[in-house]
Amino acid sequence: MAAASVTPPGSLELLQPGFSKTLLGTKLEAKYLCSACRNVLRRPFQAQCGHRYCSFCLASILSSGPQNCAACVHEGIYEEGISILESSSAFPDNAARREVESLPAVCPSDGCTWKGTLKEYESCHEGRCPLMLTECPACKGLVRLGEKERHLEHECPERSLSCRHCRAPCCGADVKAHHEVCPKFPLTCDGCGKKKIPREKFQDHVKTCGKCRVPCRFHAIGCLETVEGEKQQEHEVQWLREHLAMLLSSVLEAKPLLGDQSHAGSELLQRCESLEKKTATFENIVCVLNREVERVAMTAEACSRQHRLDQDKIEALSSKVQQLERSIGLKDLAMADLEQKVLEMEASTYDGVFIWKISDFARKRQEAVAGRIPAIFSPAFYTSRYGYKMCLRIYLNGDGTGRGTHLSLFFVVMKGPNDALLRWPFNQKVTLMLLDQNNREHVIDAFRPDVTSSSFQRPVNDMNIASGCPLFCPVSKMEAKNSYVRDDAIFIKAIVDLTGL
């Protein structure tokens, strides 16, 4: 007899992903790598299939429920019931943890000479190395951890500052541009040499400062001279003849334009009168259009109200349809459950004798060989109407010592409705048979339960651990004689001795 599987308890703790492989100062062995992130294991956990994972990686994988072990699938060693990742069966691998933490490590930061063990790196140096590159939260640039504070205070172009002249907030990169427009920025008068004149008062100073050079008042008619404010009158006296000549020239140039403007004025009056007539016509048209717009707006509002009512009705009907779909879905589930129970009741027997026909044998065996469906459970059967509930479990490509060479057949004690009235542990002789369909050479094996085994105690879960015959029938024997497999089907018979019940 052989037990199928046992699931040890486990727990998970959330930490960080694995250590970078650049940390190790020696050649890295594959057994120290996480099967998920492929980095050095951090707080290793071992799954029931034997693969190791970082605590963080395993928790991430199991966040959506139990999963198939990707490493088993990749290595081609997937095993049904074993290659499953679940929190209840994973456990902390303290031996691997001690090995990993004792590995020699070096700091990966350029220029850092720190050396020690991986455990010392995690507890004393990780995240604290002054030469480690970190991201500046302001400018998003990379700076060394030891220089981060100085960078944030004096060098970061995105650091927050305030103008020392007007106290306006700005970032470091915009200080110079702000000084070009700052109203309090100090300026120096080129005329009188006065310093620290706020920009907002500089133009007032220029108007009153006698030393500032300003354009001549006749610059509009051609004088290009600039003179100090206090010498403006002296300049006008000295340049009186030139200014009069410039003024005369401007007047002579403007005279013909004035005549043209007079003629243009009469044309403009005529155009204005024409435009007034057109405007009156357009006003009448606009009044008509306004009334039409109001009518269309009222129609649109009525349509909008009707649309909202229709939308509310559609939403109400949609909600009812969803409720009906949910109700139909629940009824479908209930119907499927009832159909399954009816099928189980039709297949069940109540005298301790059960014959199980396995159809599509070739296809099911091929699926077992491929590892897709290695085991099949039979319908339940009973020793009596109120007796023990049992089923069979068969591995068409073998299990354990019989894998690949034998047909493995197991007996399973299931949780039944009348277990409280029965005698435990289960102690009835069990006979298992592969029937020769010519009724000559049946393959028979029998055993009496080991009452100390958990397989035969009163079930706590839906079914106990399977127990039976991993070497029940050689595959070669079945293939050599075609009377065991006929019409692509085999028959398994189980007989439970009812003596003493």
Swiss-Prot record:
EC number in record: 2.3.2.27
Location of the protein in the cell: Cytoplasm
Coiled coil stretches, renumbered: 299-348
Pfam families the record matches: TRAF-mep_MATH, TRAF2_zf, TRAF_BIRC3_bd, zf-C3HC4, zf-TRAF
PROSITE patterns given in the database record: MATH (PS50144), ZF_RING_1 (PS00518), ZF_RING_2 (PS50089), ZF_TRAF (PS50145)
SUPFAM superfamilies: RING/U-box, TRAF domain-like, Trimerization domain of TRAF
GO cellular component term of the entry, any: cytoplasmic side of plasma membrane
Modification Phosphothreonine, positions: 7, 22, 117
An example molecular function term from Gene Ontology annotations: protein kinase binding
Sequence ranges assigned to domain MATH in this UniProt record: 351-496
Reaction catalysed by this enzyme: S-ubiquitinyl-[E2 ubiquitin-conjugating enzyme]-L-cysteine + [acceptor protein]-L-lysine = [E2 ubiquitin-conjugating enzyme]-L-cysteine + N(6)-ubiquitinyl-[acceptor protein]-L-lysine
Domain-level remarks: The coiled coil domain mediates homo- and hetero-oligomerization. The MATH/TRAF domain binds to receptor cytoplasmic domains.
Function: E3 ubiquitin-protein ligase that regulates activation of NF-kappa-B and JNK and plays a central role in the regulation of cell survival and apoptosis. Catalyzes 'Lys-63'-linked ubiquitination of target proteins, such as BIRC3, IKBKE, MLST8, RIPK1 and TICAM1. Is an essential constituent of several E3 ubiquitin-protein ligase complexes, where it promotes the ubiquitination of target proteins by bringing them into contact with other E3 ubiquitin ligases.
Protein name (record): TNF receptor-associated factor 2
Organism taxonomic ancestry: Eukaryota, Metazoa, Chordata, Craniata, Vertebrata
GN (gene name): TRAF2
